[in-house]
Amino acid sequence: MKNSQKSILAIGGIGILVFVSAFGGIFLTRNLGKTAKTVNMEEASAVIERYAKKIGATQAEVIKSAVELADTQVDELPDIDKNEVTIQPVTKLYAEIFSTYEKCGKGKNGWMNEVAEKFNQAGYEVDGQPVSVMIRNVASGLGMDYISTGKYVPDGYSPSNDFWGKMLLADGIFMEEISSGLVNNTAGILLSKDTQEKLTKRYGSINLKTIVEATAGGEFAMGYTNPNASATGLNFLISTLQTYNAKEPLSEESVEGFQAFQTNVPFVAYTTEQMSKAAETGSLDGFIMEYQTYINDPGLTRKYQFTPFGFLHTNPLYTTRDT
């Protein structure tokens, strides 16, 4: 009996040793032939999997890009060097002009750059001193903020329309109008051809009121530019308010109407330049833009239809007190 017990214990002990040896061998050799990177990835994946089991996900409500129409403070303005100088002066005595993208951008949007270059090459003098000009690309509203806060005041200012100059004058800031309009431009809404066809079929015609109502109803994805910075955006804001109440655009009816529209706007660009780049992705059914930018872009004219709205963009030119 004792011998049988000893035999059973011996066999059991041998079995345990064999199991331990086998398991130990597998454990010690599990990473043989694998690189350190592979081993680390496997270990990391295992850790992530353990944590992932403890995480629960919920679907958040989508928040649209509402714009707060608050006053701009001087400390919120970017350093002036963040705004590109598109034409450098060639003399010690020069005048700096704030201009907008559609005048000092690239290609056909850079006609003011071409004029400035020719001026700088002409060798003009004032009181016997050689003079030149510097052009800086600054959005209409941002330029007004620099001037009104006094953070940076240029010698000349050419926004896309005269709203900005009128606001500066209304605030008691000296501005002398050199030209009421350097060149005329038109604000408009671009709609994809499918969207244009769909809205025409539903509403009978395409106009600002139709587009605003369709956007407020969530019928298509519309983008617009920030009215604090963009002349086209400000034009759109004023024109939209007037579609609800032409006599009192700041009435409760108008404000509520615009808020309903804005709730269904998925994208607000800071400037027309940003809107133009965003349009290249094809993610928007409609957005606002000036005609000059639209007509000079074959990609836009091929995909979208232009519907004009609002006030004329005359591109005035002002000088400031320091000039």
Predicted regions and their residues:
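Short helix-loop capping/hinge motifs at secondary-structure junctions, enriched
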Residues: 194-203, 229-230, 242-250, 322-323
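Periplasmic-binding protein-like
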Residues: 181-188, 259, 295-322
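N-terminal segment of the mature folded domain
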Residues: 12, 33-229
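Hydrophobic single-pass membrane-insertion segments
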Residues: 23-37
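Ligand-binding pocket segment of bilobal, Venus flytrap-like solute-binding proteins
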Residues: 242-306
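Extended alpha-helical scaffolding regions
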Residues: 236-239
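N-terminal Sec-pathway targeting helices
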Residues: 2-16
